Amino acid sequence: MTQFEPVIGLEIHLQLNTNSKLFCSCPSGMADNPIPNSAVCPVCTAQPGTLPVLNKGAVELAVKAALALNLEINKISLFDRKNYFYPDLPKGYQITQLFKPISEHGWLEVNGRKVGITRAHMEEDAGKSIHHASYSLIDWNRAGTPLLEIVSEPEIHSADEAYEFLTKLKSNVSWVGASNADMEKGELRVDVNISLRPAGIKTFGTKVEIKNLNSFKAVRDAINVEIERQTEMLNEGKKIKQETLLFDKEKGETVSMRSKEDALDYRYFPDPDLPPLVLADEWLESVIASRPEMPARRKERFTKDYGLSDYDAGVLTSERALSEYYEDTVKTGANPKNAANWITTDLLGAINAAKLDINDCPVTAKQLGTIVTLTDSGKISRAQAKKVFEQCWQTKKDPEVIVKELGLEQVSDENQLETWAKEAIAENPKIVSDVKSGNPKAIGALIGSVMKKSKGKANPGKMNEIFAKLLQ
């Protein structure tokens, strides 16, 4: 049986995070507005005599996204018309960038190697068709929303690599604020182009396109299903037909939608209503200079400067706001490793349970830093610290105030601790005998006795040291 290599390319449509549409002042991001056709105007509904005016903010976000994907910025780019008729496309054409896009020749690191990005170009979104049994309705709220279409090179060779590519792309573009990239809201849409070729052969096989992918998991599942389908067909001597497929996640299969259109069908030509987009050197330099430290670099710094594990650094740099929260916590003087442990377990656990975003977290970085420091200094135990965290979450009070109000501060005075230790030794001769007979774990019972005497306020770490000294 012949071994085949998958050859995969991705086309990603990214909704840019602007307040208004690409060529008019109508509000953007209104696709889910319950009132259809309420965010439209003569421009985005293509009324006669209207002209497009390019949104400068969309250009800036497109450049920021492109830089985050290591793309080269073209200082001069052009807009073109992609001609096709569809009811939710009011003009009868889509304004896009075919001949001279705003950016080209980028890459993302996947599985230890660079996967190329052919281009990223600006274009406007179409509207939305709502189909009923005997009629269809059109909602143009989404028409004209600014998109950045990102096209990868056919250099992805597995479903897992495609998943990693998309995960890094989403992380990078959301990191720079270009897009929220939320697939559930339609802010990031993915089409997959895939073909198979015999291992070791460089020529491409017949490709198919897969649509209707609403999550990264769906992308991974669809690729695996299609690889299996094509492998079976090729081994049976059948030919792959060039077509567009839909992925049915319920049945776990790809279904034919239509034969694949040739790009020439769209009759592209330059848009006569839009002049060339020229990016001034000074403006472009200011955008480049405003770039934040990117996730990969920040992750590397966290492992090097703070001694974090690769896993913890990865979690903390999964979102820009989360990484900044962590650094703000460390700036309070909190131990970096212990702060990371608190954030990756207690804090994120509470945030996820409450279905909140890190920006909405009721416990500030300063407050968490105080909790970490109180614990590390021995003033409160880890168990008590959790109580303080919960109270801080609910009341937003200062942790030190909560410690005083609840009477949680541990006793660390050695004279008092030694007095309790001697009392526990006198009251528990059997346990003392066990310790002296070579069972050091029995000290735990003595510490438990002291914790009862102190109503849980004795510092257990110091008690362990004192018992070890007294029972030598």
From Swiss-Prot:
EC number, UniProt record: 6.3.5.-
Gene Ontology BP, a term: translation
InterPro entries: Asn/Gln-tRNA_amidoTrfase_suB/E, Asn/Gln-tRNA_Trfase_suB/E_cat, Asn/Gln_amidotransferase, Asn/Gln_tRNA_amidoTrase-B-like, GatB, GatB_C_1, GatB_Yqey_C_2, Gln_synth/guanido_kin_cat_dom
Keyword Ligase carried by entry: yes
Domain of life: Bacteria
Disulfide bonds: none
Keyword Hydrolase: no
SUPFAM superfamilies: GatB/YqeY motif (SSF89095), Glutamine synthetase/guanido kinase (SSF55931)
Single annotated GO MF: glutaminyl-tRNA synthase (glutamine-hydrolyzing) activity
Keywords: ATP-binding, Ligase, Nucleotide-binding, Protein biosynthesis
UniProt catalytic activity: L-glutamyl-tRNA(Gln) + L-glutamine + ATP + H2O = L-glutaminyl-tRNA(Gln) + L-glutamate + ADP + phosphate + H(+); L-aspartyl-tRNA(Asn) + L-glutamine + ATP + H2O = L-asparaginyl-tRNA(Asn) + L-glutamate + ADP + phosphate + 2 H(+)
One Pfam family, short name: GatB_N
Family note: Belongs to the GatB/GatE family. GatB subfamily.
SUBUNIT field: Heterotrimer of A, B and C subunits.
Annotated function: Allows the formation of correctly charged Asn-tRNA(Asn) or Gln-tRNA(Gln) through the transamidation of misacylated Asp-tRNA(Asn) or Glu-tRNA(Gln) in organisms which lack either or both of asparaginyl-tRNA or glutaminyl-tRNA synthetases. The reaction takes place in the presence of glutamine and ATP through an activated phospho-Asp-tRNA(Asn) or phospho-Glu-tRNA(Gln).
Protein's name in the database: Aspartyl/glutamyl-tRNA(Asn/Gln) amidotransferase subunit B
The organism of origin for this protein: Elusimicrobium minutum (strain Pei191)
